[in-house]
């Protein structure tokens, strides 16, 4: 697939394998399953947000730096620093203090990450029996927690100072959890089998 720049010449922009699969296989399958009248009604993935919370960043600022480097390696984008919204004395937390980092992926970067996540990272999870199918929010979005960042092949296990987890949110245009479940399943997410 080619696109044109401002002058009108063609630019070769590679389309990810998963983006092509969405157009060729997922859309027709969802159209048939949910009986959509229009192709624009078919749900699609709009963004993937990856968040690493580093609560100990107040006492050890180096932990936040390593979390940001690891997140940049995993996603290929520079992470945003997340700051505390309000002070909580029990946690020794002050307002505006850095407590984590986040990256939001869209379009081709989102599909590339999802492809790597499903094919390379998920099979490396210890004692994996399928992703939870109860983590939908009621509006068609799915969030899961990863306990170890070392499941991603971009992370060198020998250079990791400490194991830390992350939250990954998949935001879709689906109106119901059933539609979102079908969409993500068609895109290759290995969910646990539903007990009906």
UniProtKB/Swiss-Prot annotation:
Coiled-coil region(s): none
A family per Pfam: Ribosomal_L5
Gene3D superfamilies given in the database record: 3.30.1440.10
A GO-annotated cellular component: ribosome
GO MF, one example: structural constituent of ribosome
GO BP term, example: translation
Keyword rRNA-binding: yes
Top-level lineage group: Bacteria
Keywords assigned by UniProt, alphabetized: Ribonucleoprotein, Ribosomal protein, RNA-binding, rRNA-binding, tRNA-binding
Mitochondrion listed as a keyword: no
InterPro entries: Ribosomal_uL5, Ribosomal_uL5_bac-type, Ribosomal_uL5_C, Ribosomal_uL5_dom_sf, Ribosomal_uL5_N
Signal sequence segment: none
Subunit structure: Part of the 50S ribosomal subunit; part of the 5S rRNA/L5/L18/L25 subcomplex. Contacts the 5S rRNA and the P site tRNA. Forms a bridge to the 30S subunit in the 70S ribosome.
Task performed by this protein: This is one of the proteins that bind and probably mediate the attachment of the 5S RNA into the large ribosomal subunit, where it forms part of the central protuberance. In the 70S ribosome it contacts protein S13 of the 30S subunit (bridge B1b), connecting the 2 subunits; this bridge is implicated in subunit movement. Contacts the P site tRNA; the 5S rRNA and some of its associated proteins might help stabilize positioning of ribosome-bound tRNAs.
Protein family (similarity comment): Belongs to the universal ribosomal protein uL5 family.
Name of protein: Large ribosomal subunit protein uL5
